[in-house]
Amino acid sequence: MKKSRKNGGGQSEELAHPPRTTFDYPVRLVAYTLIAAALCQLILLAVRGVGIEFVARENGPVELTQVGMALFASVCLMIAAVQMPFGRTLLIVCGCLVGYAAARECDSWFESVFFDDAYKYLAGVPLLGVALVALVRGRKRIVVESRVLLRTPSMTIFAIGGIYICTLCQAFDVPDLWTAGGLSESPEMTKAAVEEFAELFGYLLLAFSGIESLAMAFAHGNVETRSVESAAAEATCIELTTPQVDAPSRRAA
């Protein structure tokens, strides 16, 4: 009887504080779509206002925005790794990968201040060390945890953004793709513009995945005693607690 009362009391307490769905996953997806559409319009306005040479140049506004988004995603993933008791290894590795991508986008700055390929050594080596330490410490759990974590919205968006950047954007960077069709007034600038714009939206996806990592990690602020499946479900609001009509009768019994 005591156990049933305890369960009934816990259930009534949960019903008294239902999870908020104001910023659940479908709503965030709509917000992400609006942000991407707004970013596209800003690019068009910038090109028409100041010219494509300024917008798409090396270390220009678009590339600096890419760096900012990549750093944002990396920080979000690292914070999620600290907060989550499950899946930390994959989150840390992904955070290091995006951090290295941010450094790679700043390669010309690193070379102008330090030396050729400086980003590989000044940023890549430390990040590689962090990733290796995380892999060694989590080697016994990484396979199981990664299989579960890859089902979450955060890692799904991260994977899509990574595939997009590593395939389509790299194809855009091949000069023959733009010169084989014939000469134009500025084929190199056209190539650079399309590549930078395409990468920008890829990094935007990575930034969204960072937000989803935080949503999963801080789902109702109580993930210490639960698995990543329950945290992801709560963050996406897939499994909402619904009132039980027969709860009073159970307690009465």
Question: Predicted regions span which residues?
Answer:
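Short juxtamembrane and helix-loop transition motifs at transmembrane-helix boundaries
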Residues: 26-28, 48-59, 77-90
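Membrane-proximal helix-loop-helix units in multi-pass membrane proteins
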Residues: 95-151
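Hydrophobic cores of alpha-helical transmembrane segments in multi-pass inner/ER membrane proteins
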Residues: 35-36, 66-79, 124-138, 197-213
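Non-cytosolic membrane-interface motifs at loop->transmembrane helix junctions
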Residues: 54-64, 111-123, 184-195
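Juxtamembrane "helix-exit" motif on the non-cytosolic side of transmembrane helices
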Residues: 44-54, 104-114, 171-182
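Membrane-interface helix-boundary motifs at transmembrane edges
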Residues: 20-23, 79-89, 141-153
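Membrane-interfacial loop-to-transmembrane alpha-helix junctions, especially the N-terminal start
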Residues: 25-35, 85-96, 153-159
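C-terminal transmembrane-bundle signature of multipass membrane proteins
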Residues: 168-182, 194-246
